Design a protein with these regions (language model features):
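Alpha-helical bundle regulatory/interaction domains
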Residues: 1-190, 195-200, 213-214, 229-232, ...
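HTH DNA-binding helix-turn interface
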Residues: 206-215, 257-265
Length: 296
């Protein structure tokens, strides 16, 4: 059953949003850790925070986003590959818009796409340009599915077909960095380097390849996302409860928080944040094979 949220915008007007998460089939959960479906009944404008890589299938309506530097519109049938993002962006939905999405883990990116993650970081691109022609009918099956149960099944078929088991992947590195990011405080970069039998140059190169950025930026991003998650999941009303000593001062914390979440901590607590708040709440409703889709 869809989660129906009755929310209000800054002007007190009621906005209806349906949001639900789904688990992919077990064989691909390390690659695609969750699916989601969102439907909005009215015009909705919001800020999207920095995210992990994902796919978005526009089922109905129209979505506008400025992640690529200028506002672009996407309509029914558009399928978008979004690399890992390291900054916030604006998004807007017209009434009746429905979007189906999939969260892609770093392992999933390596198995599914023949392009380094940093090449598509902070970018929205057509999915069709990065998949084999033989998979295009499977993409259409997702768009044409009559309900969410069949859409999830169609998505499972698509991602299963996209997997390249022969591709060489440094799974040990992926696991080590994932564990580091899952709890980034107080695990600074020096901690990661000290625990790996690799040079700093190797770590930088592999982080860009699999995670979309150098480790320092990756750490800053997830530290800020963790802070926002705690505000939501613990229902905190004072941002100072999550401002830890790893920041040089309060101004540093506020700047970092806003860079990746799109709002200051106080604005995050008091503002509408329809999409971010709903996604964070709904993520807790399913188990996540990878902590990446839960945190980011």
């Amino acid at each position: 059953m869809n989660k129906l949220a009755i929310l209000t915008d800054y002007f007190g007007d009621i906005i209806l949003v349906q949001f639900e998460y789904f688990r992919p089939q077990s064989e691909i959960r390390k690659l695609v850790s969750s699916y989601y479906n969102v439907t909005v009944s009215d015009d909705v404008s919001d800020v999207m925070r920095a995210e992990i890589a994902n796919l978005r299938f526009v089922i109905a309506g129209q979505v506008s986003a400025d992640l690529n530097g200028a506002e672009e519109q996407y309509g029914p049938g558009d399928t978008l590959l979004c690399g890992p993002t390291y900054r916030w962006s604006h998004v807007r939905f017209t009434p009746g818009t429905q979007v189906f999405g999939a969260a892609i883990t770093p392992m999933g990116w390596a198995r599914l796409f023949d392009v380094d993650a940093d090449q598509l970081a902070d970018r929205l691109v057509p999915l069709e340009a990065y998949v084999e022609p033989s998979t295009l009918p499977l993409i259409q099956d997702i768009l044409d599915a009559p309900d969410e149960t069949q859409r999830v099944t169609a998505a499972d078929r698509l991602f299963t077909a996209m997997v390249d088991p022969a591709r060489r992947i440094d799974e040990e590195f992926l696991d080590q960095v994932t564990a580091w990011i899952a709890s980034p405080e107080p695990n600074e970069l020096a901690v990661l380097i000290s625990e790996m039998s690799r040079s700093q140059r190797q770590i930088e190169r592999l982080c860009k390849k699999y995670f979309g950025s150098a480790p320092k930026l990756l750490h800053r991003k997830f530290r800020a996302l963790h802070s926002a998650n705690r505000l939501t999941w613990q229902d905190l009303t004072d941002w100072r409860d999550i401002a830890t000593t790893v920041y040089s001062d309060q101004s540093h914390f506020i700047r970092e928080f806003k860079q990746f979440n799109g709002r200051t901590p106080s604005e995050f607590i008091k503002g509408a944040h329809i999409l971010v708040r709903m996604t964070l709440q709904q993520r807790l409703q399913i188990d996540h094979e990878s902590p990446f889709s839960l945190i980011g």
